[in-house]
Amino acid sequence: MLGVFATSIAAMLLATPALAQDRVPVAGATGTITGRLTEALKETPVVGAVVRVVGQEVATQSDSSGRFTLRGVRVGIVTIEVRRLGFAPVTKGNIAVSPAKPAEVSVVLRPIDVQLDAVTVRPEAFPAQMAASTPVSTQTYDAEEVRRQPGAQEDVLRAVSIAPGVGVTSGGRNDLIVRGGAPFENLFVVDNIEVPNINHFGSQGSTGGPVSLVNIRFIESASLSAGGFGARLGDRTSSATILTLREGNRERIAGELNVAATQYGAVIEGPLGKNASFFVNVRKSYLDLLFKALGFSFIPSYEDATAKVVWRPTKRDAFSFLTIVARGSISFDNSTDSGRVTNSQVVNPGQDQYFSGLTWKRLLSRGVATTTLGRTWTRYATSQRDSLLVPVLDSRSTEGENTLRTDITWLAGRGVEIETGTIFKYASDLRYDATLAGFTRRDARGNPQPLRVDTSFTALRNGTYLQATWQAQPRLRLSVGARNDWYGFLDNAVRFSPRVSASLRVDPVTTLTLAGGRYYQAPSYIWLVGDPQNAERLKPFRADQAVAGVTRLVGSDIKVQLEVYGKRYGDYPARRFRPQAVLSPSGFDDATTDIPLGLEPLESTATGNAFGIELFAQKKFGASPFYGQLSTSLNRTRFTGINGTATRGAFDSPVTANGVLGWRPNSKWEIATRLRGATGLPFTPFVSAGSLAGTLDFTRYNTERVGTFLAADLRVDRRFIMRRTQFIAFLDLQNFTNRQNQQAPVWNPRTRMADTNPSIGLFPSIGLNLEF
């Protein structure tokens, strides 16, 4: 395999002259940039702004709708600068200009006092102020930063995992560990639709999985807030990831054919009349071919489809519709004894799912109102069999939920911004049919407690918020908010969550930030059916957070940020059969070693805390051909279960570090590398003898750690530019040093001993993308 990929690298290198050639694109190759300028908060069009391409003699002005078109732009990755009297100038980089189709961008301009010193008003690559909903601990990545991430395998969640304070559970999954919290504590919002899980083969009751179902080519921006977010975002205690998908291009019909790390697909997009656009994408995996070639006895397969339509009938109204449909399954080859033994330790997470939403955005005289009607639906077919093909776990369930939310932003005058809104969620289709063998579900004394449940119910809840932000002085910004959540399915529980934040600009390049608040989260629906009393014992759990930080700009395209944080958990789900532990599902847990999916007696009595410090530095791509970022996090996480003893959290990783360095020498080539390191996660050793051999020994809960995680990734992109077509080839080497990081040991039923569990090591992939 290594020989094949070495040959591929050589072929790419020989396809063009040396990298050190002049940084000028193919002669005569040009493209178009189209976009829209809006005013921050009000989202009204910005008319008459000058938009120019940095380093090229191409410029234009925005029209009465705030739209602009830049033609004759040399192909490659470019930066535009936007200036308008009364607004802070903005630069927007990483715009990929192609001869095949227009690059569509959106730029938000912030009003300023025209009397401010001119020397302090300069174009910057980073927002001067954070949004009230994400005042601290937030990193935003544009489309190109997400796409080109080394080792991400074109997965948006792996791409944003480089943010400070964020880790992953293992190399083969994208579950996000944010400041010591469990993956189920993370919120995901796609085009204003809250989605329980955006992954193929997603973990039921949690948020992670092996591969995202959101196509990375449609990402306009991806923001991850690691904590301290405002009152608009709720029902999660750790983080919020907000994905904004771009519109289809409005110039002409265009398409793409692509092959990526694990799938191939096609895209078509273009205008629908004068005021509308669309895109449609279908993808199918070829993992079945890879797994068969590598000799695996279990063969995963998935496919998905994405469609989005945007219609702007007037200057004040915009409608958008998004839908993503996906399905995934795993087939097993049980023709050999070794295959049956291997398959007996693999959970089959078959899933069919979709989410969709219709959004209406209306510009008001001094603000904007947004209403979204959405639905999420997933059908799970989770199963596991032992080496004799006897069922161990069989869980078939459906979770369907309808959502209606309205958000209003209003400029009240005198520097005051008001944000308010409400969200109703009605889970109209909750059905669970689960069977769990007794030997996999033992109580604290080791007695088998088999489970058989067949039930259905509905759930209604509401969250309403109000937040006021005051620009008290040109350099001081204060925000106070509150959120009230009602959970009809949890005995009509009501929870009140205050939030506060402050931002002080000490000088033109230095800003101090502070945020704090209370955050509540409802237990996952499947946890309620793990025991007849769970619905009575479980209640919303909480996290009180405080974050303080300082951010300094070192030039217009370099940012350095230092933050300290603390979290204190209460009413966290504790495990009655495992009194030492709190609930912390993290993926395809082997049902033969511990109880899966939270199908066990739980109660809201656990507590916990997490503290840490993070250092983050980022350089955007600009005049220099280099870009990169570096983050280092120190963290300590502890939880206390029913037994009253504080122990390491399941996702306690004291040291996490990420580094990315990229070089774009010309319009054809790009080379980037990523270094990742983290303290190994805790694990619980196995009982090694007796009738309980092969089960986890919770008397030694999380007393061991796997080895330090280290990985280095490399990505090389090559663009081939033709008259009306662009072809992009890339080579992505995940863990190119072939280091086999250790994961938690697995139990070998043949030897009745714990085996080491190394990761796959080097994972190379080639990607091809044809734009036409």
Mark where each language-model region is.
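Outer membrane beta-barrel strand-and-loop segments of large Gram-negative receptors
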Residues: E401-D407, R452-T458, G463, K539, ...
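Transmembrane beta-barrel wall of Gram-negative outer-membrane proteins
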Residues: A260-K284, F296-I330, N348-R375, W410-V416
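Gram-negative outer-membrane beta-barrel transporters
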Residues: Q473, G566-R568, D594-P685
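Structural signature of Gram-negative outer-membrane beta-barrels, strongest in the C-terminal barrel
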Residues: I324, E399, T409-E417, I423, ...
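Surface-exposed extracellular loop regions of Gram-negative outer-membrane beta-barrel proteins
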Residues: E194, I198-N199, S329, L430-R442, ...
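Periplasm-facing N-terminal accessory domains of Gram-negative outer-membrane beta-barrel systems
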Residues: P17-P127, T134, W470, R475
